[in-house]
Amino acid sequence: MLLCSLLLVSCGNGVDKPYAEIADKEVRPILKMAITKAGGLDTWQHIKTISYTKRSRLFLEDGTVESDRIQHHTYTMQPEFSVRIWWHEEGRRHEIDYSPWRVIKKTDGKRDESVDTTALKQNVMSGLYTLGMPFKLLDEGTSHNYEGTTSLKSGEEADVIKATYRPAEHQNHSTSDVWWYYLDHQNGRYLAAMVYHRPTYAYIQNLAFHTDLPVKLFRHRKSYRVDSLRNVQFLRAEFWYTDFKIEMAEANTD
């Protein structure tokens, strides 16, 4: 079922199975520690809905603000996966409704027939992918490689996991970009990520988390344009996540 891929649910086979299916054995204990640190796989699997507000500010190379947008997100994870995102821009209301069978973009209540539905779907799924880290590293079809440790400029020593994706083969993959994830070597805390989106690199720093939720979710992040060695060129974006509401599904006692 598609829902199993989206939620990383092993469909009753226990929480150890996703880790056992990771080919690189060095990745397994590191990722398990990171997911435990973030609240645990079982907790993530039992989320029914997540809603939150996201503010995104994009910057040009000279520091000028390119855009400043506030969006409201609702993800229904089970029993049937769906997404609703809405925001106001230039006096108009925009809304995206997504399910595994369709994706619709509306402006002021009218369906936008000109929208690229493939790109829209990728954007929606990328949002869940970002929000669900590090849990989403267990998505079916993800290829992992352990690349040792590195010292981040923020001072932490981090384990580096490289992740690659094949969207042509796996419908739950939203990108073919190459990602690197930086997890605290001592406790598995998700510190940062880097993505190669041809022809540029972006380094995303996780600055603060909400720690009063069933799982640990972002509060504040910054994204920098960097080179392949993570040398910063300029601040590209800043993100704030607020107003989280999480509804948990009832545990199956069978």
Feature map (PLM): residue ranges:
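Sec-dependent signal peptide recognition
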Residues: 1-3
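C-terminal motif of bacterial Sec signal peptides marking the signal peptidase cleavage site
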Residues: 8-10
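Bacterial signal peptide processing site
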Residues: 12-14
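Soluble non-cytosolic domains of exported or imported proteins
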Residues: 21-28
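N-terminal mature ectodomain segment of secretory-pathway/periplasmic proteins
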Residues: 22, 33-111, 147
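Edge/loop elements at the starts and ends of beta-strands within beta-rich repeat scaffolds
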Residues: 43-47, 154, 215
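Flexible, processing/modification-adjacent segments and terminal tails
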Residues: 102-173, 197, 252-254
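Gly/Pro-enriched, hydrophobic low-complexity segments
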Residues: 156-254
